[in-house]
């Protein structure tokens, strides 16, 4: 007869085999990249590798701290997101090589942040000591707002880094048409439009002029910020819709189950009233 501990390990392996395999493969990959960066003397990238290994532990920490179980699909998405952002994006320079790499990650970020916001509220919503009850629609709306708030705060961070350290986290965009009230000849509140812009000339304090050869006007981050927020919106909206139908189906939606964390000890006790008092119910 197998030892109980061995049986427990076998059960965990059967249930979480896919997550375990992805976790092991990604960690091995990060360690190999870190060794290569140490050999090349690039210690900034070594730090990113160490940070990635620490972030890989985040799903397990969340499960223990919040007493929840993350679905395999959601946990794999989180691990791949971390790897794609830090290793492939930063060290592999995918942000530069693939123009839409950052856009895809911001979309995933919106999805994952909505998942976090939704799960926290859903856990509280089903807790035996909860003093209010949110309807599925309100849960979805709050999860959506949580994700968008995180997205806005991140853009604040990018702007701060650009202003203080000139990191260009808010990527530039070359445009050929602009409109601005600062160009109005009368100084009024009427926007003046410049079309067919083909280059930007920088005039320095000593009178030196340098044509940048950009093929247009350099927009310093505005369009990138709006694009990031828009795709964050798409990711957040997608998860909020999934979460809404999950709650409406009382957790029976098989597709939604792949993305919704499950609270281990949040069910109401049997002697608790089946209906939440109307004064505490938000519909």
Task: Pin down the residues of each PLM region.
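Short, Lys/Arg-rich, polar N-terminal cytosolic tail immediately upstream
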Residues: 1-16
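Membrane-interface helix-boundary motifs at transmembrane edges
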Residues: 13, 61-73, 129-134
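Membrane-interface helix caps and helix-loop-helix hairpins in membrane proteins
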Residues: 38-43, 65-68, 91-101
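Structural signature of hydrophobic alpha-helical transmembrane segments
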Residues: 39-53
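Cytoplasmic-side transmembrane-helix entry/capping segments in multi-pass membrane proteins
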Residues: 50, 69-80, 103-106
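Alpha-helical transmembrane segments of multi-pass membrane proteins
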Residues: 56-60, 81-86, 143, 147-154, ...
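Interfacial helix-loop-helix junctions of multi-pass membrane proteins
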Residues: 91-102, 148, 152, 156-239, ...
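Short, highly charged, low-complexity non-transmembrane loops/tails of multi-pass membrane proteins
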Residues: 253-279
């Amino acid at each position: 007869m197998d030892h109980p501990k061995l049986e427990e390990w076998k059960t965990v392996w059967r249930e979480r085999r896919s997550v375990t395999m992805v976790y092991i493969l990604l960690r091995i990959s990060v360690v190999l990249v870190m060794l290569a960066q140490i050999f090349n003397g690039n210690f900034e990238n070594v730090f990113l590798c160490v940070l990635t290994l620490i972030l890989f532990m985040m799903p397990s920490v969340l499960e223990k701290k919040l007493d929840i179980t993350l679905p395999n699909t959601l946990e794999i998405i989180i691990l791949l997101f971390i790897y794609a952002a830090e290793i492939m994006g930063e060290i592999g320079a995918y942000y530069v090589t693939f123009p839409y790499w950052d856009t895809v990650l911001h979309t995933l970020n919106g999805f994952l942040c909505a998942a976090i916001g939704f799960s926290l509220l859903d856990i509280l919503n089903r807790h035996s000591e909860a003093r209010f009850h949110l309807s599925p629609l309100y849960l979805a709306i709050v999860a959506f707002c949580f994700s968008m708030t995180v997205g806005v705060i991140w853009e604040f961070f990018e702007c701060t880094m650009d202003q203080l350290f000139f990191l260009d986290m808010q990527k530039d965009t070359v445009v050929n048409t602009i409109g601005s009230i600062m160009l109005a000849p009368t100084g009024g509140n009427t926007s003046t439009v410049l079309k067919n812009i083909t280059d930007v000339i920088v005039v320095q304090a000593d009178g030196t002029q340098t044509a940048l050869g950009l093929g247009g006007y350099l927009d310093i981050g505005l369009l990138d910020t709006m694009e990031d927020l828009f795709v964050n919106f798409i990711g957040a909206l997608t998860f909020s819709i999934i979460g809404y139908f999950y709650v409406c189906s009382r957790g029976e939606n098989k597709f939604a189950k792949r993305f919704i964390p499950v609270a281990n000890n949040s069910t109401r006790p049997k002697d608790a009233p089946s209906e939440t008092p109307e004064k505490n119910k938000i519909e």
